[in-house]
Amino acid sequence: MSYYVAHRLFAAHDRALAAQLAHHLARKLGEDHVFLPFCDTDEENLVADVKGRRLFELDRDRLRRIRALIAIVHGPSPDDGVCMEIGYAAARGVPVILLTTDFQDYSTAPDGPRTDFPDPLLDALATRTVRLPRLSATTEPSGTSRFADFARRNQAQARQAIDACVDATLQLPAPAADTPAPSPSSNTVYTEPSPYVPPHHPLSVLTRNPHVTTISQTRFEAPDPLTAARRDWTAALASARILVDASGPETPPGAALLIGAACAIGRPAAAYLSRSSYTHAAGREPNCRNLMIQYGVDAILRSTEEVTTWIGR
C-alpha cells in the first residue's frame, strides 16, 4: 500500500512543491511506498488512444490501494482534481492529511464561523490539517536583493510545512479495513448546487420530482458549518444517486469531493454543466473538465431536459 500525494499539477511550481513533499516522504517510507501523479504516470510522455481517460484510470487504480492520501490544498478555488481524490479516499475510510500554507480563513458571512478551507466539507473530511500560514522568521539579509530574501523566507516556510506534513503522516494509526459503503436509500438523490451561480439556478428547480426524494446541502447556511458538512456527507453517501452542479471556473470543491465519493463506492453520479471551456494538452483528447471529474461521473448533463430525465429515471 502506498501514500498518495495529491496536488495541482498544471504548473511547474505546483509540481515542484509536490515533488519535494513526495521526496521527503520517500526518505522515511521508501520510494516504492509513495505515489506522485504526473511523475509516476509519466504524463508528459504517456501515449494512449484516449490519453485523458487512461490517466484517470491509472490514478483511480492507485487510489483503490492506498494507505493514506496527502493533499496540497490552498486558495479560494481548490483544485477540483485534488478534491475528487480527497473525496475518493475519504469515502473509503482512508486517512486524509491536508497541507496548506494559505494565510486566509473562510466563512459564508462576515461574522460567520471560520474554516481553513472555502468549503467546510474539506475541513470535515480531513483526518489532520497541517497549516503553516505565515512566512518563516526573518533571516540575515543575503546581500543580493530584498526579492531573494523574500524568496528564501517563502522557501523556508514551504520546507517547514513539508516537514510537519511528513511528521503527521508518520503518526497516523495503523490502517483499518475499508469502510463499507452505506446502503443507499431507494429513490433518493443528493443534489449539490454550485456556489458560483444564483440560488434560482435551474438545478434547484429541476430536482423537484414527486416520485423522487431529493436532499441538498445545508452547510453553507448552517450556524455550525462543520457539523452540517458531516451531515451533508452522510446524506450524500446514503443516497441512491448524486447530482452535482459543476458550473464555475473549476468544478466547485463540494461537487468534486462528492464525485470522488460516488466513484469510490460505486454510486451513480452526474454533473450538470451547461457550458464548458475545453482544455487541450499534447496527445490528449479535448477535455471539458479536469480528467478526474470528466471521467469520474456516469453522465455530464448539458441541458435542463437532461437533468429532468436523469432525476426521474
Regions found by a protein language model. Give the residues of each.
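Conserved catalytic or regulatory cores that recognize and/or transform ribose-phosphate-containing ligands
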Residues: 1-313
